[in-house]
C-alpha cells in the first residue's frame, strides 16, 4: 500500500477543495510498476483542517496510523481491522493527540521504526519546525502512546528533516555495506 496527502477538488478547474483540507489517499502495487498499480481512493478524510504526513505501523495484531493534523498536530489512532485501508468500513480509536507538541511546539513528518535489539520497543521521529529537525520519541506499549526520549545514546545532526527511516538489522546493514562498490569513507 502506498499513501500520500492530496487536496481533492470538487471540479476539474480546481476551484473548491472537497471538505476544505487535505486527505490521505492510497493505492496498491505488488512491485511498484505501472502494470500492478491500482488507485485505491480515500484512506483518511482530513475534513476542514486536513491531514498530511502519515506513517503506518503494524504490531501485535493492530494497525496504527501516526498522522499530522493541521489542527491537532500529530495524532495516533489504532484499529484491528484486517482491511485497515478501507475508509468506508474501518473504525479507528484515538490513542494519543498532540504528540510532541508540549516540548517541541509545531511538529510534523512522523517516522516510526522498530528497535531490533529490544522486543516491543518502537521509535518515533517528529520534525520540530523550523529547527532543529527530527526529535526522537519512544514507546514500549503502542496502546499507551509515545514518550520523549531523553538519552545521550543517540545523535542526530541539526536540520535532519522528515523523510523515511528504513529499519535494518545489523546483518542487513552489513550486507548493504559489503555490497558497496567503493567505501563511503575516504582516508
Where are these regions (language model features)?
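Carbohydrate-active catalytic/glycan-binding domains of CAZyme proteins
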Residues: 1-187
